[in-house]
Amino acid sequence: MISIDFEYCSEPKDWGLDAPYKDKPYAVKLFCVSICNEIGTRSWWLQDADQRADFIKWFDMNETYLAHAYEIAEAKCLAQLGIDPGLVNFYDTWTISMLLNDTREEASLVNMCKKFLGVNIDADIKELMRDHCIKDETQGHEEEIMRYCESDTVYLKPLLEKLAAVYNYRLSLSNCIALGTSLDYTFTDFIESTSNDIRASMIISKQGIPVNAEYMKRLQSAMTQFKMDYIQEMNSRFNCFKLKKDGTYSEDQAVIQELLKKEVPSNWVKTASGKLSTASETLKELFDCHRPDKRFGEWLFYWKEKVQPASKGIADGSWLTSLRGDRMYVSTLQPLKSKTHRWQGRSKEGYVPLWTGWTRAAIDPPEGWYAIECDYHSEETAIYGVIFNDPKYLEQYRSGDAYCYNAINMGLLPKECVSKKKCVTLEQQNMRSTIKTFTLAWQYGCGVKKLSVMSKLDMDKTKDYKKRLEDVYSESMKSKRIIGEQLGDNGTLVFPDGYPICYSNQYGHTTKLNAPIQGFGAYILRVVVQRALKAGFKIFATVHDALWILTQDINDGQRLKQLMEDTARELLHDDTLEVGEPFILAHGDHKCEDSEDTKIWKKYIGD
């Protein structure tokens, strides 16, 4: 439930919600403040009191306060649910209506739940509000709050949680709001990117462009493209949409009914009420894995075809895990190749008895066992240097601080600033921070416009920095351009073990600028897993460029490290790529209170 933190808003006069919200109902104000406090207590960029005040002040001046607050809160909710925060659900006509405070019958969240879940949540809404009406600050406003709650304006998180399981319209966040196209999102990255987008919106606002209109225009455009892609995909399979005279499409119910009479396709799902979903709800199979993981598609294909049979009895054959947000993902997937060259499948949030933190798995293995992680150190940088034969990337790999190295070679920092500690002035520290953001966005294929937004630089300076960075890594840029010319905007690269990586600039997954690197990293990890399983290691998680094993021998960490280094050396024909020291957790190092722990661990070690 979205909590209301009254510490910062004990009196209405302190809320800072003057025009245009001074005449708005109490419940709307309450919702705005609760959202602001919620994200304020969780987001690093709002920890500072002055930043917090500026944030509230800016939103007070814009009609889009509710929409933006909702957008951020929703993404947080999705992350907490284990749903990729790089996707934004529910951006369909109903949700747009809700964002605009529309309480028409068809816009009702209650009716949506009845339609898609087969459940009545009226009582849930009322119970939610009763919990909060006990607060002194809400006394005298109970009826008003109840009325607004029932019209879907406040406390949406528990309802979104219920809806998220079956209502799967998903849009790439990079298509909805101007973020980087294929950053390797963790939840922290998402919060940082979202804050940059808000700052960009502030700039738009100052230039006199209505933020709300601009936002809705981009959103509507992305929605239209998304739905057309979906209709084309479904028609290629089932021919279940028909073109109407006005140029729009509608479901062909006759075709759908015929399909339902036959054996139900395995990719069709049942709703909570037990009814079979129709074509418009099979997005679970089509778009559930539409997320910018560094090398998700080609790896899960390998997992399904090769690792699953080999690891039977070790990892239950379906436990592909990757860090995303504040928990681990567990995916069971049926990969397919669509017309847009995207690898996709079906994923679901599953229980893994190891996650409690933000950026690292916190595991409490059974007594007498160790959970050990080994990962490659700066894998992408090393692969850039070796595969593209770029001496600058190899120098960067050994420099100890990639961002200082880049800034020095770009002529933006003096040669003595070889590390963060050596950047002694505020100006030097700020420059390193800027180049860090700039380098990451550039390396993942962002264009000039996105680079400008991400690094908060004007266009002229952005173009200058981009040119300087490309000059530093001129050798790898040549190779990138050759690949781009040969394969165009969408294509497939096949690696030595026969598995492909597919990329699409249209959707901003793995782009042609980084596909060779991500794909080769996946290739290395595939071979490592194959050899580790053959050597008897019990692998229970893979996280991008890392493995987690469960063992009773603490020395297995060093053995796994050696196996990973030997494999990289053999496949790259180079000894550059290193493996960090094993991260070891014993029983009791982290407390895991979930009662399912013992049951789940048996999947890995037996009775």
Task: Please describe what each predicted stretch is.
Residues 433-444:
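Short, amphipathic alpha-helical "recognition" segments used to contact nucleic acids or chromatin
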Residues 28-58, 63-180, 406-421:
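Active-site-proximal helix-loop-helix substrate-binding element of RNase H-like nuclease domains
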Residues 189-295, 444-483:
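Extended, well-ordered alpha-helical scaffold/bundle regions in very large, multi-domain proteins
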Residues 4-40, 190, 243-424, 483-546, ...:
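Acidic, glycine-rich two-metal-ion catalytic cores of nucleic acid-processing enzymes
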Residues 129-248, 388-397:
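Mixed-charge, glycine-rich, non-catalytic linkers/tails in nucleic-acid processing enzymes
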Residues 220-249, 467-481, 554-607:
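Polymerase palm active-site segment centered on the conserved acidic dipeptide of motif C
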Residues 92, 152-156, 199-208, 212-213, ...:
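Catalytic palm active-site di-aspartate
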Residues 4, 9, 27, 163-169, ...:
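Catalytic phosphate/metal-binding cores of nucleic-acid and nucleotide-processing enzymes, i.e., regions
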